[in-house]
């Protein structure tokens, strides 16, 4: 077996499949593009769903890739096992309706065992297969596998929701009896027992059925085009090839671990307790790549995953004695390890380091808050005479504050308490099951549409024509190809079209289809790309249409031009965001509609009013400079040399369109644009908001809509000016400042009146002093408009020696507010209000001298007041 570096293993995989006619698909962003079903790209095939479900027919049906992926269903296992990771690389080879079982198995065996390639010893390889899949069993024997190395497994059938499915055959490497201390042997494989002897290195899925959850597996229909979908974990392959005990002892992780050794002063013990080293090495890889791809730590979705990973890694750093931000220092090491295939980490190093360090510092503050929360739990339990911290509280400390259970157990032990481990595990399991359910739900592929897949006639889009004559080459009605159609809805394909199919965030053209006499025979209501790339016109049929006849295609030119203005403005906006916010503010999604444009971009905080003003100003300046908009067609490499901005994760063909706007913007884009920025007229941002962790959204309008937006603002200002009796709009700020000053004065006077009224009322309330067990107390219901007035009563009470304790209750709206104030150490206001609050179906708490509670059961107010004496 050859000794290879991880970079060599990856490259050898890609090179081998290239010799078999496969196109090398580059690794795409971990953040899915145009796929809301996925939180992360979680497999090599996830980026190819559009090919497998038949939405798009690839230029080459043979594809290979090395795809970075993230899975976070079982984060807690990372570091505990030899091969569990959050981020990993999946090597794959795929056939979209081309070769099938025989070639897939033959070539897999060749790649693994040929001296020219990996040169694995054949006797070390074992294969599992689906019992009913005799064809795979026979093929393995034909290529030279000993039948005793073929193990039938009932679970070897791949399906995930609706869509492509089929039997799979897995390849395992036998590391020998040294990794099988109980000498169980092949039962480890046959009974699917977790083990370190037989390492799964490759799974070949023979995708031949359309899975349908509504019917039994035996009734699944055959796919019109059978596919091959395979996945080999790079980390596992490298561990086997490099003879490493675990994946972490390979050149993918050890450089990171060595850096952690330097930072901690601790030594990584391969056979000892090394979990913290593994967790840190794994998690910083995920963080570096995910942040580099535009995801940012936050409180939901992808952001929550990253925040959790960072906090877990940070806590393990503390276990190694690292008590300051350190993860950001590991980013360059991650970048250097992966540089040969993933240069983006080093290219974005400064930004990634900045985000990681900021999040580490934030976590340090959160951890401090968590310690206060934990101490509060301990104090409450002591008050109640209890000694077990509830599993729900342990989970909250873990989930909200990043506290590992061990830290909570230490706090509990110091207080002479224990932790409800079972309750915590139950809460953890519930969360993991939710995550798994979500992952399964989002993983399915759509059903293949055989009719559209089989339409292979050529069709071209004419960018320059708003109207042209073209032959009708395909008609689809009721999901079948027909020769003519006379009514209803149909889908049409023409040899040439002037209609833009929805793509790249630009909406489709609308318009009409006319016959030779000029009669409108159909209205076009939508245009989408068919699987083989043709423009598929959805039409309402008004008169008979027949195949191979010439028709005139006329788009709605006014609609197209309005969309073009918004699309070109989007390019200007993208450039302005880079200039003002930074190069990290890249496109995360866009929509160029008729009346507006919507642009999503990565940014780690809300855009300030000053920044928005500067962005809007810069875009308008470029509009008024009347910059020429040019489009050229070239190959992708030339386009990148020109400096064209490519959207990370987007798939580009060999030939691309480059759109330049003066020397201000240059992007790869397949959409339609104005010829000169002056055609846009005006640009106005109408809204900026966050739509998820690390993602912001700008809504803007151009041209007539921008003018109308400004006019609406002007009309509103004029209305305000009239209300304020300001002769001119420019005097409105001065008038408003005057009103604000008047309001402040009135509020001050009102507060003074309230204090006087409270003092007057207090005179009567404070006279009603009772005594029990040597404690003087006042317990009374008062009539006030807000809870703040209760505090005013308490402030007045503190001024004189009326009593030791004050309890005030007020019905405000449909709620009940309670205030407890104490002047003696013997009476703890916070504890007392906690005991009283349940009477009114409420909760509360506070300090020893002042506490408040809120509830909803107003009929129980008197019962609460009567209960005070019994609590003293």
Swiss-Prot record:
It catalyses: tRNA(Ala) + L-alanine + ATP = L-alanyl-tRNA(Ala) + AMP + diphosphate. The keyword ATP-binding applies. Zn(2+) binds at residues 567, 571, 669, 673. GO terms for biological process: alanyl-tRNA aminoacylation. It comes from the Bacteria. It is found in: Cytoplasm. PROSITE patterns: AA_TRNA_LIGASE_II_ALA (PS50860). Consists of three domains; the N-terminal catalytic domain, the editing domain and the C-terminal C-Ala domain. The editing domain removes incorrectly charged amino acids, while the C-Ala domain, along with tRNA(Ala), serves as a bridge to cooperatively bring together the editing and aminoacylation centers thus stimulating deacylation of misacylated tRNAs. This is Alanine--tRNA ligase. It comes from Streptococcus pneumoniae serotype 4 (strain ATCC BAA-334 / TIGR4). The gene is alaS.
């Amino acid at each position: 077996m050859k000794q290879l570096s991880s970079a060599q293993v990856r490259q050898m995989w890609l090179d081998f499949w290239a010799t078999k006619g496969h196109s090398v698909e580059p690794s795409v962003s971990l953040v899915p593009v145009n796929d809301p079903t996925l939180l992360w790209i979680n497999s090599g095939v996830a980026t190819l769903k559009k090919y497998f479900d038949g939405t798009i027919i690839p230029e080459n049906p043979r594809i290979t890739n090395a795809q970075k992926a993230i899975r976070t269903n079982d984060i807690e296992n990372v570091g505990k096992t030899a091969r569990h990771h959050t981020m990993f690389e999946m090597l794959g080879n795929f056939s979209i309706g081309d070769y099938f079982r025989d070639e897939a198995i033959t070539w897999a065996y060749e790649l693994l065992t040929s001296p020219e390639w990996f040169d694995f010893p054949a006797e070390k390889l074992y294969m599992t297969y689906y019992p009913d899949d005799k064809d795979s069993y026979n093929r393995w024997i034909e290529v030279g596998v000993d039948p005793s190395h073929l193990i039938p497994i009932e679970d070897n059938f791949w399906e995930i929701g609706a869509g492509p499915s089929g039997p799979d055959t897995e390849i395992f490497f036998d590391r020998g009896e040294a990794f099988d201390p109980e000498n169980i042997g092949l039962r480890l494989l046959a009974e699917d027992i977790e083990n370190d002897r037989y390492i799964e290195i490759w799974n070949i899925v023979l995708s031949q059925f359309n899975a349908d959850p509504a019917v039994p597996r035996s009734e699944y229909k055959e796919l019109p085009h059978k596919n091959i979908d395979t996945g080999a974990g790079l980390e596992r392959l490298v561990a086997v090839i490099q003879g490493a005990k675990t994946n972490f002892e390979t050149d993918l992780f050890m450089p990171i671990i060595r850096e952690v050794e330097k930072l901690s002063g601790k030594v990584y013990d391969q056979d000892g307790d090394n979990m913290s080293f593994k967790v840190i090495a794994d998690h910083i890889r995920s963080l570096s790549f995910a942040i580099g791809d535009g995801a940012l730590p936050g409180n939901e979705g992808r952001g929550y995953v990253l925040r959790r990973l960072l906090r877990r890694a940070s806590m393990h750093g503390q276990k190694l004695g690292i008590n300051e931000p350190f993860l950001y220092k590991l980013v360059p090491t991650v970048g250097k390890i992966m540089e040969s295939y993933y240069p983006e980490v080093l290219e974005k190093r400064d930004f990634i380091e900045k985000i990681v360090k900021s999040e580490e510092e934030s976590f340090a503050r959160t951890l401090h808050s968590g310690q206060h929360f934990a101490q509060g739990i301990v104090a409450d339990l002591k008050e109640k005479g209890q000694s077990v911290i509830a599993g729900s509280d342990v989970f909250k400390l873990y989930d909200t504050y990043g506290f590992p259970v061990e830290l909570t157990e230490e706090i509990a032990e110091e207080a002479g308490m224990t932790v409800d481990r079972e309750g915590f595990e139950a809460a953890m399991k519930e969360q993991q099951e939710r995550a798994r359910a979500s992952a399964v739900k989002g993983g399915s592929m759509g059903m293949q549409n055989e009719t559209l897949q089989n339409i292979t006639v050529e069709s071209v889009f004419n960018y320059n024509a708003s109207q042209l004559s073209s032959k009708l080459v395909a008609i689809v009605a009721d999901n079948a190809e027909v020769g003519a159609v006379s009514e209803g809805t149909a889908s049409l394909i023409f040899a040439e079209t002037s209609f833009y199919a929805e793509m790249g965030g630009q909406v489709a053209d609308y318009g009409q289809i006319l016959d030779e006499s000029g009669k409108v025979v159909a209205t076009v209501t939508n245009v989408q790309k068919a699987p083989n790339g043709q423009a598929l016109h959805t039409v309402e049929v008004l008169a008979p249409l027949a195949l191979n006849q010439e028709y005139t295609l006329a788009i709605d030119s006014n609609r197209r031009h309005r969309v073009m203005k918004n699309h070109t403005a989007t390019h200007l906006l993208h450039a302005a965001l880079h200039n003002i916010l930074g190069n990290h503010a890249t496109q995360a999604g866009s929509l160029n509609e008729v009346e507006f444009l919507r642009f999503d971009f990565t940014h780690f905080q809300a855009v300030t009013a000053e920044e928005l003003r500067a962005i809007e100003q810069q875009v308008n300046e470029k509009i008024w400079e009347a910059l020429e908009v040019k489009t050229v067609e070239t190959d992708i490499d030339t386009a990148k040399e020109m400096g064209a901005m490519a959207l990370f994760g987007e798939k580009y063909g060999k030939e691309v369109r480059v759109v330049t706007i003066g020397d201000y913007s240059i992007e790869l884009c397949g959409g339609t644009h104005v010829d000169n920025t002056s055609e846009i007229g005006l640009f106005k941002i109408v809204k900026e908001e966050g739509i998820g962790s690390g993602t912001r959204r700008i809504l803007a309008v151009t041209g007539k809509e921008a003018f109308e937006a400004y006019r609406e603002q002007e009309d509103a200002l004029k209305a305000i000016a009239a209300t304020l009796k300001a002769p001119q709009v420019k005097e409105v700020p001065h008038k408003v400042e005057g009103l604000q000053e008047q309001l402040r004065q009135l509020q001050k006077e009102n507060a003074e009146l309230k204090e006087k009224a409270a003092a007057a009322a207090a005179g009567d309330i404070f006279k009603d002093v009772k005594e029990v067990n040597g404690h003087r107390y006042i317990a009374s219901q008062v009539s006030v408009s807000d809870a703040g007035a209760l505090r005013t009563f308490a402030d007045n009470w503190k001024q004189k020696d009326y009593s030791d304790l004050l309890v005030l209750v007020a019905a405000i709206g449909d709620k009940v507010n309670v205030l407890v104030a104490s002047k003696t150490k013997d009476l703890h206001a916070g504890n007392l209000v906690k005991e009283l609050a349940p009477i009114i179906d409420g909760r509360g708490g506070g300090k020893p001298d002042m506490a408040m509670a809120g509830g909803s059961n107003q009929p129980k107010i008197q019962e609460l007041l009567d209960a005070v004496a019994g609590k003293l």
